Amino acid sequence: MCIRDSNGINGTQALKEVSATKVSSKDFCHYDPALNDKIGLFGQAGSAQSELKNNGVGIGDLFLFFGWFKKTENPKIDIHKIFGWLQIEEILEGDKQIANFLKKHKLSHPHDPKYRKYKNNTIYVSRKNFGLFKKFSKKLVLSAPNHKKSMWQFPKKYFASAAKKKSNIFLNRLKWKDNRKLLVDTNIGPGQEFIFDAQEVPDISLWAKSLTEE
């Protein structure tokens, strides 16, 4: 992790405020997804990649990336929030494909086999429309108010009808905790690949579009 000043905030101090006391200036982060370069890239491997592949994730599908965010001035406030997106243009499978692509486009990525060997190594390459949400918006917050951060609440406009009909929204591990309040508990063991079926429920695509076009 490269710890530098950002917008007047010292990186080392910010990490200490969120209890990341074991991080030093000599540590490096696994920068993935990489959404700041000319081509967006997202690496997966092992069982996580198998889960995506087995559920039919492919060309044209959209990743919405979420993370854990804290307000450093008040550590008691923490949320899950969407921070970026990537629509799949190409899927690179295996070390040879990945290495050749990165070399051709003069890109660096932690899934480059010269850095580390991964089982089932895969990189998802973006279409031109990808990026980071650089401004805070309540629309990007997943955590439900007055709940732990892992309890998500989805917007009524896009999810209420499908939840009421008990449509098959979730393709893998998620399920409704309370379909009337549109609550889903994501604290269900290891893994963070949550796959939604936008073919079954087209309103999911409209929700994603409302975020990425904001």
Language model features: what each stretch is:
Residues 1-3:
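Short, small-residue-biased leader/transition segments that mark boundaries at the very start
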Residues 17, 51, 89-93, 193, ...:
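Glutamate identity and glutamate-enriched acidic tracts
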Residues 9-79:
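Short N-terminal edge-element motif at the start of the domain
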Residues 77-186:
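Aromatic- and Lys/Arg-enriched surface recognition patch
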Residues 177, 184-214:
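Extended repeat-based interaction scaffolds and adjacent low-complexity, acidic/S/T/P-biased segments
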